[in-house]
Amino acid sequence: QDGQEVDGPVHLGQQGAAFTAVDPCEAREEEALQVNGAAVGTLAESCNRHGVLLIHVSTDYVFDGTSPRPYLETDLVAPMGVYGHSKWEGEEAVRKRLHHHLIIRVSWVFGVHGNNFVKTMLRLAREREALEVVADQRGGPTYAGHIAALILHLYGRTLEQGSTGWGTYHFCGSPVTSWHAFAEA
């Protein structure tokens, strides 16, 4: 609520709400752009007005996936679909409205909560005799708990040391693998 109903000072904004269902984003473009783009811009404006650090979580979907090497933060983006485009819009909204921000691009997120690849594979393994999983896409499966720990670390470092290296960072698990190999594991 724009910091108006908070009892005490606010030092950190962490954008956690997102429309992350890639395929449904294609059919619901306006909603994806609103949630992943415009709403993020509104949050960034509020953080700017109140002097709050914003940590925004984005995605590797801002790239087209054709690079033979891991993407660098300085690589040009080329989102292929609505989801990637909407997340890029969110990143740009943060950059335009707020100098003090951290954008963390993650990939292949899995964890205990929510829908994700690991939970889907476990469910399908119970329901089917055999599974077919693509082997031509590579990435770094990233445990959601590690992302949370990184956010806490970055926030703690900012509190202790003051200004830090604002900008965009990539964070993913290792080793890099294919969806097929990840499913087999």
Regions found by a protein language model. Name each.
Residues E92-G140, A144-H153:
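NAD(P)-dependent short-chain dehydrogenase/reductase
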Residues L150, R157-A185:
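Mid/C-terminal beta-alpha module of Rossmann-like enzyme folds, strongest
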